[in-house]
Amino acid sequence: VGQGTTLDVVELLWAACGIDWYHNEIRATPKLGILYENFSKKNPNIYHAFPFNTIAMQTDPKYLQKCILNSGLFAVKKGKVTDLDTVDADVIFDCRGNSDKGNIEYEPLYCPVNSVLLAVGRSPTNPQLWSRHVATPDGWTFVIPNTTDTTSYGYVYNKDITSLETAKTNFSELFPEASESYGEHFDHKQKVVNLPFESYMAKEPVRIDSNGRKIILNGNR
């Protein structure tokens, strides 16, 4: 999904690419904090505020990638890499992630959720200037504003406990406004996209290979 950022990412993008709010080529929306809803019985709304003089953002990943690749800061070669030995570089960020359960470079992590339903709805009249994280009977849902007068919804749940149909029903009942296709962000046509995922971590995130190159493991497949 990857739309939200932390405060330091905004500073880095400004320093490296000169990204600004007027041109906004990455289709960013302001993120002034994080609102946790219904996670506590005593306090239904817990707001994690950022310092008043700082700001994070939510971006469209597709446009953020395009902006960085077109920045002119480095040469870009497009291709499918299956063997890192074919890459001529001193430092390699391997963002392919773990695609093989027998991959000895990664180990699984326990996570109570392992699937997400993605959809889009129209934006509310009043602008949302923070990320919403809403507790649900099956897990939680992220609610993120976009620049296209839409809002992204991600209903996160455990597919081994909650069936897909039950999750879809609860999603539509709790967020009836999330009824449009996520296709503008991803190559999907259906209104609600189900995306299962696994949680894992690299046993050795940074290592030196036999050729003396620094390999940094990161990312998901």
PLM-predicted stretches and their roles:
Residues 1, 48-54, 149-154:
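Glycine-/proline-rich flexible loop or hinge segments
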Residues 26-36, 80-82, 187-196:
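Short, glycine/charge-rich beta-strand/loop segments that flank catalytic centers
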Residues 36-72:
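Mobile amphipathic helical/loop "lid" adjacent to a hydrophobic cofactor/ligand pocket
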Residues 62, 66-176:
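Predominantly flavin-linked oxidoreductase catalytic cores and closely associated redox partners
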Residues 58, 147-149, 156-221:
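FAD/FMN-dependent oxidoreductases across multiple families
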Residues 1, 9, 13, 17, ...:
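General structural concept
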Residues 19-24, 75-78, 180-181:
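Short secondary-structure capping/junction motifs at helix and strand boundaries
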Residues 1-45:
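N-terminal FAD cofactor-binding segment of flavoenzymes
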